[in-house]
UniProtKB/Swiss-Prot annotation:
Protein name, per record: V-type proton ATPase subunit C 2
Organism: Ascidia sydneiensis samea (Vanadium-rich ascidian)
GO CC annotation, single: vacuolar proton-transporting V-type ATPase, V1 domain
Family of this protein: Belongs to the V-ATPase C subunit family.
Pfam families to which the protein is assigned, alphabetical: V-ATPase_C (PF03223)
Ion transport is among the record's keywords: yes
This protein's UniProt keywords: Hydrogen ion transport, Ion transport, Transport
CDD domains on file: V-ATPase_C
InterPro entries: ATPase_V1-cplx_csu, Vac_ATP_synth_c_sf
Self-association state and partner proteins as the record states: V-ATPase is a heteromultimeric enzyme made up of two complexes: the ATP-hydrolytic V1 complex and the proton translocation V0 complex. The V1 complex consists of three catalytic AB heterodimers that form a heterohexamer, three peripheral stalks each consisting of EG heterodimers, one central rotor including subunits D and F, and the regulatory subunits C and H. The proton translocation complex V0 consists of the proton transport subunit a, a ring of proteolipid subunits c9c'', rotary subunit d, subunits e and f, and the accessory subunits vah-19/Ac45 and vah-20/PRR.
Entries under Gene3D superfamilies matching the protein: 3.30.70.100, subunit c (vma5p) of the yeast v-atpase, domain 2, Vacuolar atp synthase subunit c, domain 1
Length: 384
């Protein structure tokens, strides 16, 4: 798991000076609390402060929704990879590189999200991108899951318990009486623990059961399949009395073609599943990248909007990405709070999700004197 802090602080004389100040605070004097990378947000159309205030709630909801779609795509990719889930990490990328590299080198995508558009329009464009992926994921996953479920059901009947398993691949023509007007062969699944009861009672389960006709055809850990011969006219009586002893009559009429047809069906569905798997995995890889990069652009919009609302106009702030190791996070937080404590006019400095006292944070999960957003990359661990 990687945790990134996307923060912004007001520009000194220039944003570059702010960046250098942050670098010195996080990496200087031998502290090495965290790497510090520029988070490049272009100048966007500010509009009115009222419009920015109105956007904060929309962007917050979109942020949560987009992260959720990222996690759904990653989780489903792990599900599709099945016994190769250990390869999930290598399939999660952003653009041409890794998720970590994307965070370290974030650049606004001018082609997809032109900055001449108002922030509200950019928000709508990003929302449409993510919503479309979410919709497509539902339809594609449903189609693949239906095929996978059909194959699993057929394979279960071919390889599962003798109580449910398809008999066409177990019994042979010679196991059945063929062409008799009066007699028929009945296949009965008997629990292993009741074999003795079966041998003792099967001849008395109806009036016309052929003596000494019971034959064990096969067995597994739970059940044995017995064949016995009865008169056709007592079939229902025999079946009913079997159920009283917890013997299970398998409804089955032998057909030599059934086994071939069923195996052909399994092979056909397995082939369709394999053909669907490749394109589905490619779609998941491409669209995870699409949604993840959209998510970080949404973070950038949130940083920009909150920075303008906090630090005022003209726009003058520097956003950076920090990736502190867990052992350094508390120390880094203290350094940043000391560096920017003068910016706080709320009395809420140091209120965060871990340290806040219930009821005293005024409903705010995290608040710092600088703009702060967290990005946690734990898609692999959440998908297993």
């Amino acid at each position: 798991m990687s945790e990134f802090w996307v923060i912004s602080a007001p520009g000194d004389k220039t944003p570059q000076q702010t960046y250098e100040r942050l670098q010195k605070a996080t990496m200087g004097s031998g502290q090495n609390l965290s790497n510090c990378y520029k988070f490049s947000i272009p100048e966007l159309k500010v509009g009115t402060l009222d419009s920015l205030i109105g956007l904060t709630d929309d962007l917050g909801k979109l942020d949560t929704f987009c992260e959720g779609v990222c996690r759904k795509v990653a989780s489903y990719m792990g599900e599709v990879l099945e016994d190769q889930k250990d390869k999930l990490s290598s399939n999660l990328s952003a653009g041409e590189g890794t998720l970590v590299n994307f965070m370290h080198r974030f650049q606004w995508n001018m082609a997809k999200y032109p900055t001449k558009q108002p922030i509200k329009s950019l928000t709508e464009i990003l929302s449409k991108v993510v919503t479309q992926v979410d919709t497509d994921l539902r339809s594609k996953s449903q189609a693949y899951n239906n095929l996978k479920s059909s194959l699993q059901n057929m394979e279960r009947k071919a390889t599962g318990s003798l109580l449910l398993r398809n008999l066409s691949q177990i019994v042979k023509k010679d196991d059945f009486i063929d062409g008799s007007e009066y007699l028929r062969t009945v296949i009965v699944a008997v629990p292993v623990a009741l074999f003795g009861e079966w041998e003792k009672n099967y001849e008395s389960l109806a009036d016309y059961v052929a003596p000494k006709s019971s034959r064990l055809l096969t067995q597994d850990e739970e059940y044995g399949l017995f064949a016995t011969s009865i008169f056709k006219k007592v079939y229902e009586e025999f079946k009913y009395n079997c159920s009283r002893y917890k013997f299970f009559v398998r409804e089955f009429n032998f057909n030599e073609q059934d086994s071939v047809v069923r195996q052909d069906q399994i092979n056909k569905i397995a082939s369709e599943k394999r053909k669907m798997l490749g394109p589905l995995l490619r779609w998941l890889k491409v669209n995870f990248s699409e949604v993840f990069t959209a998510w970080i652009h949404i973070k950038a919009l949130r940083v920009f909007v909150e920075s303008v609302l906090r630090y005022g106009l003209p726009v003058n702030f520097q956003a950076v990405v920090l990736d502190p190791p867990k052992k350094n996070r508390k120390r880094l937080r203290d350094v940043l709070n000391n560096l920017y404590c003068k910016l706080d006019s709320t009395g809420l400095t140091n209120v965060d999700a871990e340290d806040s006292v219930p009821g005293l944070s005024l409903g705010m999960q995290e608040y710092y004197p600088y703009v702060f957003y967290k990005v946690i990359l734990d898609f692999e661990s959440r998908s297993f």
